[in-house]
Amino acid sequence: MDRRSMGETESGDAFLDLKKPPASKCPHRYTKEELLDIKELPHSKQRPSCLSEKYDSDGVWDPEKWHASLYPASGRSSPVESLKKELDTDRPSLVRRIVDPRERVKEDDLDVVLSPQRRSFGGGCHVTAAVSSRRSGSPLEKDSDGLRLLGGRRIGSGRIISARTFEKDHRLSDKDLRDLRDRDRERDFKDKRFRREFGDSKRVFGERRRNDSYTEEEPEWFSAGPTSQSETIELTGFDDKILEEDHKGRKRTRRRTASVKEGIVECNGGVAEEDEVEVILAQEPAADQEVPRDAVLPEQSPGDFDFNEFFNLDKVPCLASMIEDVLGEGSVSASRFSRWFSNPSRSGSRSSSLGSTPHEELERLAGLEQAILSPGQNSGNYFAPIPLEDHAENKVDILEMLQKAKVDLKPLLSSLSANKEKLKESSHSGVVLSVEEVEAGLKGLKVDQQVKNSTPFMAEHLEETLSAVTNNRQLKKDGDMTAFNKLVSTMKASGTLPSQPKVSRNLESHLMSPAEIPGQPVPKNILQELLGQPVQRPASSNLLSGLMGSLEPTTSLLGQRAPSPPLSQVFQTRAASADYLRPRIPSPIGFTPGPQQLLGDPFQGMRKPMSPITAQMSQLELQQAALEGLALPHDLAVQAANFYQPGFGKPQVDRTRDGFRNRQQRVTKSPAPVHRGNSSSPAPAASITSMLSPSFTPTSVIRKMYESKEKSKEEPASGKAALGDSKEDTQKASEENLLSSSSVPSADRDSSPTTNSKLSALQRSSCSTPLSQANRYTKEQDYRPKATGRKTPTLASPVPTTPFLRPVHQVPLVPHVPMVRPAHQLHPGLVQRMLAQGVHPQHLPSLLQTGVLPPGMDLSHLQGISGPILGQPFYPLPAASHPLLNPRPGTPLHLAMVQQQLQRSVLHPPGSGSHAAAVSVQTTPQNVPSRSGLPHMHSQLEHRPSQRSSSPVGLAKWFGSDVLQQPLPSMPAKVISVDELEYRQ
C-alpha cells in the first residue's frame, strides 16, 4: 500500500489537499513520510474484519483484487490474465454496443479466434460493460480513467486489445444497466481466478499491479487517454495510476453501496491491512471531493476544492462575464462546476462583478443599474470562484467598443428595456457564441467604430452577438439583458436594426457592412479587413466585380454579388434598377463586391428609402446569394476567360452555360432571388426555398414565388427600375448569362477598333472598380439621353445609372442567339407599361426587330420578355433615343451570323461598332459572356431578358439558323419551355 499512498502523495496532491479525516472535516494532509510510517505501524499490519478474504492474495488482502471486483470491466482491475480473458468473453456483445468505429470493426472479428494478443472471442458475459459504467463514475476517475477508457478509442490498437480495453469500451457503452450484476459476477470470477492463479504468484500480481494491471502489452499512451474532448489525462507514474484507481474504486464503492463511507472504509480498511490505515481517512474525503467534481456530492463545502485555479478567468477578458452569464441562474442552469464556484468568501462579490460587466455598463448608461442583479442574486456563489472584482477589466467588451465607436448609446439605451423580454426569451434558447461568433460581433462593433453611419450594422451585430451572448448569459442578469435589449430595441425603433431578427444571422449579416447602406460611407476596407470577406469569395467577387463591375453598374452589382452567380444573378436582379445604382453609384469604389452585396438586407430599414424592394429581400436570400456566390469561382473563371478572350470558344461558353445553368437553377429555384435585383442589396436574395436544393423545389412553386415577388416589386420598382425582369427574366437569366458570357468576348473581337478599345477599357476598368464603370459610362454614355423615361439617379455618374436604371437607351437587343425558348407571355405589368407607351405587345417583336421603337419606349420592359417573343436580333433603339446605339438597319445580324459570332464573335454591324461598343460596354457586364460579337449584343442589360435565349448557344450546333431565328409561338406564362424545365432540374 505504500506504493499507493506514495502515489497519492505524489500524483494526487489534489487528493491529499482534499483529504481530511472523515470525522472532522478539517483537512489533514499526510506527507509521504508519514504515510510510509503509517505503513509500518502495527495497525497497518492488522487486518480489518471488514476486509473480505475473497480479495486476499497470499493471505494478504489485495486491494488490486478488490478494485478488480469493483470494476470487473477494466483490465487493470483484473490483474489476472485468465480473468481478463473471461472479461473478454463479455466483449462481443458489449462491443456491439460500442460506438467506436474501431470497435465496430472488431465486432466482425468477434467470432473469429484472434491472435492471443487480441484475445477477442465471440460470446461471453457482459460484465465488462457494467464495469465501464462504474468506471466512468467520477470525473477524477475519468482523468485516470481517461487512460483506461481510451481502450475504446485506441488508435492502431487493432492487435493490442486487452480485456482492459474491451472493458473500457464497454464502459463507454451501457454501464449502468448491468452494473451491479456484472460487478458481483466479476467479483466471483476474480475471486476464483485470483485464488487459483495468485495463490503464490503475488510476484506476478505485484508486477502487474505496478503496471496498473495493464497486461504490459500496450503502452499507456496506446490504450489510455481521454475518450472525449472534455476529459483530461493526468500523466502520472504507474503508482500514481494505481493510487488513482484506488480512489476511483472507493468512489464507486461509495456510490454503489448504500453506505458510501462504509464502502470506502472497507476498501481503505483492506488497504490499511496492506499498509495504509490512515490513508483511509484521508482518502474518504478525497473520494468525496472527487465525486463532487462530477457534481455527485452536493454536500461538499465550497472551500474544499478550489477550482478558482482552474477557472481563473480574470486573465481571459470576456470569459469571466460569459461564464457568469451562463452560470447566472445557478439553480436553473448552473454548470456542473457551479458547486465549486461557490466560494462563500466571494459570494458577496457578485454585484461587483456584475457592476463591471459590459452589459451593466450599458445599463448604467441607460440608468438601469438596479436591474442588473435581478437574475443572479441567488447565484452569487456560483460566480464566486471567478474573481468578480476583476470584471471591471472585462467590461470593455461592448461598452468600450461602442464608446470607441462613438456610438451614442444613450438614445439607444433609452428604449432598451422594451426588448428585454424578447431577448430574455431568446437568451433562454441557451445559444452560446463561439469565439468566432463573438469575434465577428466585435469586428462588427469595430466596423461601427470606424463607420458611425454603420451603427445599424453595429447594432445588428450587437443584437446578434449580444443576443447570442445574452442567450448564453440568459442566466445573466435580466438587468443586463434589459440594457442590451433596450439598446437593440432602440436601434430597431430607429430603423438601424431590422425590426425582426434576421433569420440567418451569420457572417453574411456581419458582412452586411454599412457599405451597403446606400447613403453611408462604405467601410469596404474595414469590412474586408475585419471579415476578410469571409462569406464572399474575395477572389471571385473581385474578379467578377472587376470584370463585370467596370462593365456596368449592374455588373458592379454583379460584382457585389459576384459570389452569387454573378451574371445570372445580376441579370435576374434587375440590373437596370436604379436601386442598385443609387447605393452603388454614390460610392462606386466603396463597394466591395462581396461584402456589399451581403450588406443588402441587414439594413432593410435603412435601405428601404432607397428601394422599397430591398426591404423585401430576406436575409435568406442574401445567404442564398452568398451561397451561390460560393459556387461561382468556376463560372467566374469562365466568364473572366470569356471576357478576356474575345474568341472564347463555343464549347467553353457552353461549359459556362452549364455552370450558369446550375447556378441559375439554384438561383431560379430560389423563389425570388432573381428579381431581387431590385432590392438595393446587390445580392438577388434567394428566398427561403433557395435554401432548398433547387431540385427539390417544384417548378410551379418557384414560378409562383417569382410571380408574386415580381408583382410586389413591380409596383414599387416600376417607377424607378425596369420591371422587365419578371419571372421570365429569372427563368431566362441563366440563358442570358450564357449569352452574355459569350457575347462580350465576341464583342471584343468583332467590334470595330473603337469598340475593342472601349471594351478593353471596360475590361481594364472592370478590373478596377465600380467607379471606373461609372466613369466609363460617363465617358461613353454621357451622350445618351438620360431623360428617356428613365430615372436618372443623380448619383456619382448619371450616365452609368441611366443604363442601369432603365434600359432607356434602346440598345439593340441583339439576341445573337436564336431565341429558342418559347416566348413567354409578357408579364402583365410589362404589357400595361407597353400599352401605356403606345406599343402593343404583339407588335413588339416586329418593332424590336425593325428597330423602330417609339423614342420614349422604355425597353426595360423587354427585360422580362423572352427572347423568342422578340425573336430576331433587335435594333430597337431609334437613333433618336440612342444616337450612339444607332443600329444600322443595313446590318441586321442574321441568326446564322449571330451563331457564328457566338462562335467566332465575328459579326458586328458595321455602323454599330462604336455604338455597339458603347452598348456592349453597358451590357458587357451582363453580356460579358454573351456570345454575340455585337457590342450591343444584349447590349442592354435591360434587354437581357430578350437576350436571354442563350439556349441557341447549344442549339446552334443542332439546328440551322433559319430554325433558330424563328420566334417560337408565344406561350401562356404558365408554360415552361423544355429548356427551362431542364434548367430547373
From Swiss-Prot:
Q: Where does the entry say this protein is expressed, by tissue?
A: Widely expressed.
Task: Locate the compositionally biased regions of type Low complexity.
Answer: 736-746
Region span, Disordered? 1-24, 208-230, 664-693, 707-803, 922-953
Short motif (Nuclear localization signal): ranges? 195-211
Residue ranges of region Interaction with CSDE1? 131-161
GO CC, alphabetical? cytoplasm; cytosol; intracellular membrane-bounded organelle; membrane; nuclear speck; nucleus; P-body; PML body
Cross-link (Glycyl lysine isopeptide (Lys-Gly) (interchain with G-Cter in SUMO2)) at residue(s): 410
Instruction: Tell me the GO BP annotations in alphabetical order.
Output: miRNA-mediated gene silencing by inhibition of translation; mRNA stabilization; negative regulation of deadenylation-dependent decapping of nuclear-transcribed mRNA; negative regulation of neuron differentiation; negative regulation of translation; neuron differentiation; P-body assembly; positive regulation of nuclear-transcribed mRNA poly(A) tail shortening
The name under which this protein is listed is: Eukaryotic translation initiation factor 4E transporter
Q: Supply the gene name.
A: EIF4ENIF1
